[in-house]
């Protein structure tokens, strides 16, 4: 009896696994179709992304990214044909695609049972992500501007979205997928995006995000001094006096003409009789 029950359990597990793998294949087929039903494709792949049988497969996340890429391409095709199109959908698809491809690459880098890494996704996915970086910037600017027209929770919600776009742009530069590109050195736009990420985070008082992204902007000739302001403010808000004072001193050395650092350091010494 136990053997029969065990066999039934195995059959059920196998059927569930097959069903989810079928969802992944069907979602991919829909996305690659002539008139794709993206809502259906997303419904199928979202099930696979959370199912224990398929959520750890690189292919699942690759298909999720493909759906977003195809959805963005469809909107751009409509724009080219002068048909109604959804600009925000293009931006959101670019953002989601990047995140899905990041996860795909992470899983594909796990060595197989022989200890070998066979990542068949990196080359094409990294090229696609690089091509979509402009839409991450545009999406961030769009939501940042929307936030400036609102107040309270509504503004915070849009600033959070803006930060997500800007942060993902920066995350590309530090992702192992793009190690050969050396984007931290070659991407001249990145410091500006890091500044905007810090600015969006500052508006929400999201100090951990400031401390994560502002350093990528602190050496920039145009916005570096403001990025260091954000860093100092975040360190003070988090109660790290030692690092806060160190950041003020570093700011004075890097940007002696910028009064923020010297003024706050003098105030600290005056208030503490030093």
Segments (PLM) and residue ranges:
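Post-signal peptide N-terminal segment of secreted/secretory-pathway proteins
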Residues: 32-154, 160
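TPR repeat positional signature
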Residues: 23, 61, 68, 136, ...
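Structural signature of alpha-solenoid helical repeat scaffolds
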Residues: 52, 127-128, 185, 205, ...
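Short coil turns that delineate tetratricopeptide repeat
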Residues: 53-55, 109, 174, 221-223, ...
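Alpha-helical repeat scaffolds
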Residues: 41-45, 80-101, 159-167, 207-218, ...
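Residue at a conserved register position within TPR or TPR-like alpha-solenoid repeats
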Residues: 30, 68, 143, 150, ...
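Bacterial Sec-dependent N-terminal signal peptides
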Residues: 1-29, 251
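Alpha-solenoid helical repeat scaffolds
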Residues: 58-63, 180-199, 225-233, 259-267
């Amino acid at each position: 009896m136990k053997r029969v029950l065990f066999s039934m359990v195995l059959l059920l597990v196998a059927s569930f696994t097959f069903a989810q793998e079928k969802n992944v294949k069907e979602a991919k087929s829909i996305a690659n179709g002539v008139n794709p039903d993206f809502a259906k494709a997303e419904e199928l792949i979202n099930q696979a992304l959370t199912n224990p049988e398929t959520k750890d497969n690189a292919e699942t996340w690759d298909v999720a990214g493909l759906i977003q890429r195809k959805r963005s391409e469809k909107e751009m095709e409509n724009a080219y044909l002068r048909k109604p199109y959804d600009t925000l959908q293009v931006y959101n698809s670019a953002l989601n695609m990047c995140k899905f491809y990041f996860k795909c690459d992470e899983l594909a880098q796990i060595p197989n049972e022989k200890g070998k890494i066979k990542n068949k996704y990196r080359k094409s996915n990294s090229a696609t992500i690089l091509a979509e970086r402009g839409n991450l910037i545009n999406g961030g600017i769009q939501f940042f501007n929307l936030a400036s027209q609102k107040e309270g929770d509504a503004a915070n919600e849009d600033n959070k979205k803006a930060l997500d776009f800007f942060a993902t742009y920066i995350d590309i530069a530090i992702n192992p997928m793009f190690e050969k590109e050396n984007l931290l050195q070659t991407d001249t736009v990145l410091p500006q995006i890091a500044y905007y990420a810090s600015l969006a985070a500052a508006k929400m008082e999201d100090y951990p995000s400031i401390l994560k992204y502002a350093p990528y902007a602190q050496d920039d000739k145009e916005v570096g001094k403001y990025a260091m302001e954000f860093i100092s403010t975040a360190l003070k808000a988090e109660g790290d006096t030692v690092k806060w004072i160190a950041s003020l001193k570093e700011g004075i050395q890097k940007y002696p003409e910028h009064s923020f650092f010297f003024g706050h350091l003098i105030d600290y010494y005056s208030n503490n009789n030093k």
